[in-house]
A protein has these predicted regions:
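Active-site Tyr-X1-5-Lys
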Residues: 65-97
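NAD(P)H-binding glycine-rich loop region in Rossmannoid oxidoreductase-like domains
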Residues: 1-20
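SDR active-site strand-loop-helix element
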Residues: 3-4, 40-46, 99-101
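Flexible, glycine-rich beta-alpha linker
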Residues: 49-50, 94-115
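Conserved Rossmann-fold NAD(P)-dependent oxidoreductase catalytic core, especially the SDR/UDP-sugar
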Residues: 26-66, 86
Length: 261
């Protein structure tokens, strides 16, 4: 299991991202093939598919930042190596599986702390009714899913998407902030996102990662986790617990309206 890498979605310095997220997976896969390892699971990111409406397990990618670009190259390197192994060394070719993690939240993660701060502020908001699927997930469920894949008795797909944990953009904001988010008109949110991407483009995509985070916070993103559901590989959802813990860690007083929830 390769979970090594550089988890820095807002980082603009490409060389270290390339080394950790693109080169290292290839090195590990080659080492696995040479030492007789039978199954290799590489932890990638759903960010490789960018702002597409529904995340899935296809090879289609749309990187939008230095981080997602480096993760995409890591996946492409593994897919090319898989073809090479099967063609040149079929007897020792390891089974390669790319696991695309969604927006993983956990104790001590900078992204989780920032989300909790935003959700706890007067600026907490969602687009429209806020019923879009949120890709936020817990590190606990991800770890459990990794074990499920590692011990799966059948053949794994080349790419697998981490299963949805049931959160909507409204419920995720509520859990992380312990206050009801504002419901903004969808047209206003779309206009703001479009303007944000335009400004980022003028500045060499410097703010693309941040704009994308706001877009996901407002609208969410569809998740096609049909393979995991078909095979009953569904870890215990714990994202609500993680988000509420993140809010508590901020040291803010709990809203009286949610004292018993």
């Amino acid at each position: 299991m390769n979970a090594a890498g550089l988890a820095a979605p807002n980082m603009q310095d490409l060389p270290p991202l390339m080394g950790a997220n693109a080169l290292l997976p290839a090195v590990i896969a080659i080492a696995a093939q040479r030492t007789g390892v039978r199954r290799v699971i590489h932890l990638s990111s759903a960010a490789v598919q960018g702002p597409r409406p529904v995340l899935d397990a296809s090879e289609e990618t749309a990187p939008f930042s230095a981080y997602s670009f480096s993760k995409t190259l890591g996946e492409e390197a593994l897919l090319d190596l898989q073809d090479y192994f099967l063609e040149e060394h079929p007897e020792s070719a390891p089974e390669l599986c790319i696991l695309r993690a969604t927006s993983v939240q956990g104790r001590g993660r900078r992204t989780t702390e920032l989300f909790a701060k935003m959700a706890s502020s007067p600026f907490a908001s969602v687009a429209g009714a806020g019923q879009g699927k949120s890709p936020v997930s817990s590190v606990y469920a991800l770890s459990e899913f990794v074990v499920m894949l590692g011990t799966f008795p059948g053949e794994l797909p080349t790419i697998v998407l981490q299963p949805w944990e049931g959160a909507t953009v409204a419920s995720a904001s509520l859990d992380a902030g312990r206050r009801k988010p504002h419901h903004l008109p969808e047209w206003l949110c779309r206009a703001a996102i479009k303007a944000g991407y335009k400004v980022s483009e003028l500045m060499n995509d410097r703010f693309s990662g941040s704009v994308r985070k706001v877009e996901v916070m407002w609208f969410g993103q569809g998740i096609d986790d049909s393979w995991a559901r078909k095979n009953n590989l569904l870890p215990t959802p714990r994202v609500r617990e993680v988000l509420r813990t993140a809010h508590t860690a901020l040291g803010k007083k709990k809203d009286r309206r949610f004292a018993n929830s």
